[in-house]
Amino acid sequence: MEQNDLESVWKAAMKKYYWKESVRKMKVLLYAKNRQVVLKSGVGRAMVMQEESLKGNGVEVTTDPKDDYDVVHINTIFPSDYFMAKKAKKCGKKVVYHAHSTKEDFQNSFTGSNLIAPLFKKWIMKCYQTGDLILTPTNYSKSLLEGYGIKNQIEVISNGVDTTLFQKNMLV
């Protein structure tokens, strides 16, 4: 999906659920306690694209949880992320949880992963259920989450691709 497509889908999803143009511009907290570690991963790259997309659509973005914000967007499933979502909800903030992980992705990923996959599923369900809106990158993962019994609103938004990295003149 090209960056412009991602921006339009993101903006439509955010407007549908949280846009506060009549009051003031929305401010989104892109939360990751271990941001520097996460940024080295595929999820971290998705976070960078999300930030660029939001800013490109005139949405103010912060990564500092001490700042005031309207919506917290969480991409990871660490305990600190779960507790941030709970804190935000308690303060009346909206929570967008990006569901990058499923039990099916976790299974067979390392020796012994199948033994703890049921616990992993319980944990991610607990995390994702804190979201007012759950974003997931594929229809397949959406169907898995629905199959888990998650009742929260789930929208599919493919992770963006920076098409400037694939210019014809760069393929020489």
Listing of model-derived features with the role each one plays in the protein:
Residues K90, L115-I134:
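Membrane-proximal helix-turn-helix segments that form the acceptor-binding/catalytic region
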Residues V61-S80, V96:
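Short N-terminal targeting/anchoring amphipathic segment
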